[in-house]
Amino acid sequence: MVTPWRLSVRVCLSHLRCFEFRKELGHSRPLGCSRNARLCWFLLGTLPKLISAHGSVGEGAPGSLCQRKTHWSDLAENGLVEKVAQEGPLARVLLCLRLGLRAGVLLAKFFPLLFLYPLTYLAPGLSTLWLHLLFKATETSGPTYIKLGQWASTRRDLFSEAFCTQFSKLHVQVTPHPWARTEYLLQQAFGEDWGSLLFFETREPVGSGCVAQVYKAFASISLLEEDRIWRLGELSAPGTRAVVMQREPFMKDRKPSENLADEAFLEKLLLPKADLGGSEVGVSQAPWHLPKSDHLIPVAVKVLHPGLLSQVSMDLLLMKIGSKALGLLPGVKWLSLPEIVEEFEKLMVQQTDLRYEAQNLEHFQHNFQDMASVKFPTPLRPLITRDILVETYEESVPVSSYQQAGIPTDLKRKIAQLGINMLLKMIFVDNFVHGDLHPGNILVQGADGVSPSLEMQQQQVNVCDTLVATIAPALCPLRLVLLDAGIVAKLQASDLRNFRAVFQAVVMGQGHRVAELMLHHAQANECRDVERFKAEMATLVTQARKNIVTLEKLHVSSLLSSVFKLLMTHKVKLESNFASIVVAIMVLEGLGRSLDPTLDILEAAKPFLFKGPASFL
C-alpha cells in the first residue's frame, strides 16, 4: 500500500518521468555538467519511482527492481477473486465479463460433447470418434486444459484405458510468441544490458510447448562475476529473498553488496551507458553477436508465454466453480472433483513458475551425483526468474531414435537397463520421481563411444576411484539425460512402505494382499463389495502369472493397467502421487521392452523390495 507521503512525492515529481526517455531525446540534462550534478539530476527523475514502487530504500531495493508487481503467490494464496475485490468495483465488473466470455467459449466447445456422450454406448466407433473430438477440443482450449488432459491421462484409476491412451499423446507444439516478448522479459529480468550475459545466434526457438518456449543460446562465463548478477539471486528461489547460488566452477569470490548509499553504484544503476565515459562497463553487445567461444557455454533458455498467469488463474477459477456444480451429481460424487481441481492447481502453480523446475533439477542432481549414467541439465542459478530459466544445453539424441531397427541389440539393452535402474532409484531410494517421463523428455548421450572394453574400464573406475572417471571425459560414458523436471511425485513414508508392499505382493502372486493394500491406501472409495473386489484382484494377479515360466515374461504395465481398470470399476480412488508413480513404471517398462523385450523389471526391483534400498548403494 502506498503511504500518503510517498503518494505526494510521486505526484509532485510526476513531471520528471520524462527522464525515462533521456537516452533517446538526448536533452534531459545540460551537456558538460559535473559528475555529481549529473548524478543528482538523474536521481530526481528516478528515485521517486524507487520509493513509490518499493517500501524502503536500502540494499533490498536494487534486487527488487526486476520483480513483477503481480506474483503468482498472490493468486495462489489470496485467490483471484479476493485480489480483484481489493482493486475496486470496476475490476470486479471486468473480471465478471472476462469470466463470462471465457465460460461461453468453453461451453461452446465442450457442451455439445457432453450432450453427445450417451451415443458412445451405441457403438465402439462412436466412442472412438467422441474421444477424438474431446481430444481436439482440449487441444485448442489453452495451456490449462492441455495440462489438465496430460494430468488426467496419468489417472488410470479414474478414467478409462482408451481415454488415458488417447490423452497421453497430448504434447502440443504451439505457435511461438514473438521475439519482442522474449526480449522484453530478458530486459525486465536481467537489465538492459542482458546481451552481455546471453548471446542468441537466432531469434527462432528450438521448441514451443503450451506453457513455455525454449531457445538455444550461449552464456558468458566471465560476466557471471558481475556485481549485478548477485542481486538476481533474490529471484532464484520461490518464497524467499535469499541468494542461493552455485558458485563453483563459475564464481570464486563474492563481491560486497551494493546499496543506494554508494554513489558509484547509484551512477552505474541510474545513468545510461553513454554517460559513463570513464567506467569500465562497455556498451552491451547485440544479442546475436558472439564473442570468443572459449568464454561461452551453450545454454537452453526457457521463457514462459505471455499472459499465461492470467489465463491459468481464470481457468482454474472456472474449474473450481464447475467441479462444485458437477460434484452434486450422484454418479461422480465419489471422485471428489473439488479435491482433484485442488491437486491440479498445485501442479499448475509449479508449471507457471520456472524457479520450481530449477529447484527440482538441483534436487535430482544431488540424488544422482554418484551415478554417472544419469544426468540432468544444470540450472544457472543467477539467471533464473519466475518467467525465465537458463540451464546448460545438453547435446543428446532422443531415446525414441534407438527404438528403430538397425541399432545394436547390446546398446538397446544397456539403455533399457539404465532407464529401469534410474526409475527404481527415484522411487525406492530417493522418493523423488520425475513426473513426466515420456520419451520426449529422455535423451541419450555417449552411445557412439560404447564398447566392451570401455564398459569394463568404466566399471573398474567406478569401483576403485570415482574421481578418475570425473577427470577423464574422453571416455564418454553412456548415460541418460532427463529434461522438463517441472513435475515431480513423492510419497509420505507410510505410503512408500505401502507402495513397496504392493510390489512385493505382486511378485509373490498375492492378489488378496494387493487388494487390501489398495483399499488401505485409497484416498476415497465407494467399494460396495469388498470381498468381490479382493477375489477379482486375486484372479487378476493369478491369471497374469499363469503359464509363465519366468517373471521376465510378465508385462507389469499390462498387469497394472488391468489393476487400474478394476479400481475404476469398484470406485477405488488412489492418492495422486501414488497413481503417478505407478504410471511412471508403466511408461518406463513399455519403453524399456521396446528396446529390450527380455527386460525384467520385477527382477531388477527385488533388491529394493526384499533387501531394502541400502543394497542398491
Swiss-Prot record:
Principal location: mitochondrion
UniProt superkingdom: Eukaryota
GO molecular function: ATP binding; protein serine/threonine kinase activity
Name the record gives this protein: Uncharacterized aarF domain-containing protein kinase 2
Binding positions for ATP per the UniProt entry: V206, G207, S208, G209, C210, V211, A212, Q213, V214, K302
Protein's membrane topology: Single-pass membrane protein
Signal peptide range in chain numbering: none
Spans through the membrane: 103-123
This protein's encoding gene: Adck2
Active site residues per record: D436
Protein family according to the UniProt entry: Belongs to the protein kinase superfamily. ADCK protein kinase family.
Lineage of the species this protein comes from: Eukaryota, Metazoa, Chordata, Craniata, Vertebrata
Residues annotated as domain Protein kinase: 200-609
Record organism: Mus musculus (Mouse)
Keywords annotated in UniProt: ATP-binding, Kinase, Membrane, Mitochondrion, Nucleotide-binding, Serine/threonine-protein kinase, Transferase, Transmembrane, Transmembrane helix
Key word Iron present: no
Coiled coil, from the record: none
